[in-house]
Curated annotation (Swiss-Prot):
Cystine pairings recorded for this chain: none
GO molecular function: ATP binding; GMP synthase activity
Gene assigned in the entry: guaA
Catalyzed reaction equations: XMP + L-glutamine + ATP + H2O = GMP + L-glutamate + AMP + diphosphate + 2 H(+)
Taxonomic lineage from the root: Bacteria, Pseudomonadati, Bacteroidota, Bacteroidia, Bacteroidales
Protein function: Catalyzes the synthesis of GMP from XMP.
Species of origin: Parabacteroides distasonis (strain ATCC 8503 / DSM 20701 / CIP 104284 / JCM 5825 / NCTC 11152)
Protein name: GMP synthase [glutamine-hydrolyzing]
Keyword annotations from UniProtKB, A to Z: ATP-binding, Glutamine amidotransferase, GMP biosynthesis, Ligase, Nucleotide-binding, Purine biosynthesis
Gene Ontology CC terms: cytosol
Amino acid sequence: MHEKLIILDFGSQTTQLIGRRVRELNMYCEIVPYNKFPHDATDVKGVILSGSPYSVYDENAFKADLTEIRGKYPVLGICYGAQFLAYTSGGNVEPANSREYGRANLSHIDGEDELLKGIHVGSQIWMSHGDTITVLPDNFKVIASTDDVRAAAYHVEGEQTWGVQFHPEVFHSTDGTKLLDNFLNICGCAKDWTPASFIESTVAELKEQLGDDKVILALSGGVDSSVTAVLLNKAIGKNLTCIFVDHGLLRKNEFENVMRDYEHLGLNVIGVNAKDKFYKELAGVTEPEKKRKIIGKGFIDVFDEEAHKLKDIKWLGQGTIYPDVIESLSITGTVIKSHHNVGGLPDTMNLKLVEPLRLLFKDEVRRVGMELGMQPHLIKRHPFPGPGLGIRILGDITPEKVRILQDADDIYMSLMREWGLYDKIWQAGVILLPIQSVGVMGDERTYENTVALRAVTSTDAMTADWAQLPYEFLAKVSNEIINKVKGVNRVVYDISSKPPATIEWE
């Protein structure tokens, strides 16, 4: 069992980022609702209090009872967490004269304090709060200030309790990782959470959990399901059967390429060609949500049919990852949404769930995959929607439209790799628009399809910026598509960020 850090979630948008930063420092942590501290746990080394959208003095603000936490564990309050500690200890928190958002610099630092070891005056931090601590309790000592915020950081004398009104977890706080590492050292953390240690402990747990039972797993070709398959295969070998469904909406040659990759990994995979079924059921359907539902139900039907051909299956493997687990519970403990990679499977299957990746963030899944010896092109694949090209064809879906989009997308992705751009992009693809336009090819007038290129940079898909790809690259892609893809005479580039736009068009 790994020792762990507990992050109490008060509803901040950056709570998961705190968790990722701690994990990057090789320390295992768990994010739990603010009022669900695991008091019975014996392996907790320290506690972080997250930010929150509330003000501490709001009637509906989330309030935690810290009486059994403070003094027993080292505590670090971040933003709202820092204000909550001060406010509940007798300090004052009030609306700031001007809201503090964006970059600031530390103008005063107590270099003797353990939390700020190795951090110097001038260090850039990131503020994001509308309130400020105006009066600290008597035993709270200011250890860092900015020109505008006196209590940018404090230490509670006589306790291993600290608060910072800035966000060390965000990229813009240049010494934020150093501060978090200092806190882990204060907690006495061994920092032994590594891909290798995760694989060793998880494989052992899977062997004990599954014994000689048989497991089925739906593969998508994506990172999560692929790493799940390799981990399960390492634990139970031939007792794992994987099913990979070709719904006719994969990228060009993807079914054959992915099947070859899985064979190379030694996986037992059943490949199912279900193109005709999906094309028939999608014929004439234009409404995006209806398309999604048809594709989702079709996949479940095919998977269920194949699963029933197998004997003595006891478990369903899924590539659920930690953000799915966190998001499935609100911080009040009520279910918001259920996350199932194979959602809606018939109850008659009566299978137990096994989710080997449920403790990992996405970047950790990739590192585990690399440690398992998986090929880089499998590990570094861009996210690809479950409905595939079905939501990149605006309007109704036909085999001819799929052919056009596959050819255009293949050119875009191939050139992106050739130019060394693929690994710099979070997600990219081509969208076939329900628009035709006039063009001229040779001496003839054409009236053909328009495609849009999409590429974004991101760290978590919650927000995304459109990628500023080189003009020369875009010109090359446009020229290649128009000359080589029959049925396309115009290429445009989507320069919308998320928000307000989403990454996918449907």
